């Protein structure tokens, strides 16, 4: 089984934390992976993030930088990385250093040993009660939609690129709900591992904004309609490994309708 991994690191105004995040990603990847790349997606930052990203690309040959001219959101950053990925597996690691480096070790160690990795946060009390309640609700809804007993629906993942590219493009914050639920319904085998959160103020997390919460619920509701009410079947077309390299530099652009969804 192939083991190459593309790591997407979205960053919006993360000049203080991006270097630490990328440094830990590269260190963990070197410990566990034979081949990997890191794609930093500067999502329209207005602070010193672009300069930090350029320095990281100069320091680490495995790091490349893609810039969105305006802030499009984490879902758009995910799809930018997915479109450009050169390897058969992909993980998104937030540029705000939300996860402890030990979690990266646990995740990267499983790349190529199972088709998909789903993590669960072992120290959820590092977040506020409201954030924990949101996570519990999201996880229970994901179990209902997919019929799979996962422990956490909102953490780190490793997705198989060939299958993830066949999932409906969701450029909003609910990209992970769309992708994870579709892959689980499609029968992609997975393993679960615990990860640790780094303490931080929840006020810095965009997931707690009302507009974001509404879009998350809308995405989950649409998946419930598809898979529970309409009993839609998921079938993935076989994709040759060579396809990954042929599409690795295709430009990413959002249509007006996609911007409205995001």
What are these regions (language model features)?
Residues 3-5, 26-40, 48, 61-64:
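Short loop->beta transition adjacent to catalytic acidic/histidine clusters or analogous donor-positioning motifs
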Residues 11, 41-43, 68:
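Conserved sequence signature across two-component system core domains
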Residues 36-39, 50-84:
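Conserved donor nucleotide-binding strand/loop of the catalytic core
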Residues 16-20, 47-56:
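Acidic helix N-cap motif at the loop->helix transition within catalytic regions
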Residues 68-84, 89-92, 98-173, 200-211, ...:
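Acceptor/aglycone-binding surface of glycosyltransferases and processive sugar-polymer synthases
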Residues 42-51, 97:
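A conserved acidic beta->alpha catalytic loop
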Residues 14-29:
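Short, well-formed alpha-helical segments that are part of the catalytic scaffolds
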Residues 1-5, 145-147, 170-262:
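Hydrophobic helical membrane-anchoring modules
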């Amino acid at each position: 089984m192939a083991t190459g991994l593309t790591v997407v690191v979205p960053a919006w105004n993360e000049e203080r934390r991006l270097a630490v995040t990328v440094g830990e990603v590269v260190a963990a990847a070197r410990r566990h992976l034979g081949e990997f790349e890191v794609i930093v997606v500067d999502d329209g930052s207005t602070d010193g993030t672009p300069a930090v990203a350029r320095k990281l690309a100069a320091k680490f040959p495995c790091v490349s930088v893609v810039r969105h001219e305006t802030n499009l959101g984490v879902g758009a950053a995910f799809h930018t990385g997915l479109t450009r990925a050169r390897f058969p597996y992909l993980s998104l690691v937030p540029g705000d250093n939300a996860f402890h480096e030990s979690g990266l070790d646990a995740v990267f160690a499983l790349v190529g040993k199972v088709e998909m990795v789903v993590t669960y946060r072992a120290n959820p009390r590092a977040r506020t009660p409201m954030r924990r309640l949101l996570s519990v609700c999201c996880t229970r809804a994901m179990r209902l939609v997919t019929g799979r007993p996962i422990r956490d629906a909102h953490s780190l993942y490793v997705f198989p690129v060939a299958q993830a590219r066949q999932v409906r493009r969701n450029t909003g914050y609910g990209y992970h709900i769309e992708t994870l639920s579709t892959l689980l319904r499609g029968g992609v085998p997975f393993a679960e591992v615990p990860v640790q959160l780094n303490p931080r103020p929840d006020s810095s997390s965009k997931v707690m904004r009302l507009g974001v919460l509404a879009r998350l619920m809308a995405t989950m509701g649409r998946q419930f309609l598809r898979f529970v009410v309409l009993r839609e079947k998921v079938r993935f077309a076989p994709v040759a490994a060579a396809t990954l390299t042929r599409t690795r530099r295709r430009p990413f652009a959002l249509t007006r309708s996609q911007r409205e969804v995001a």
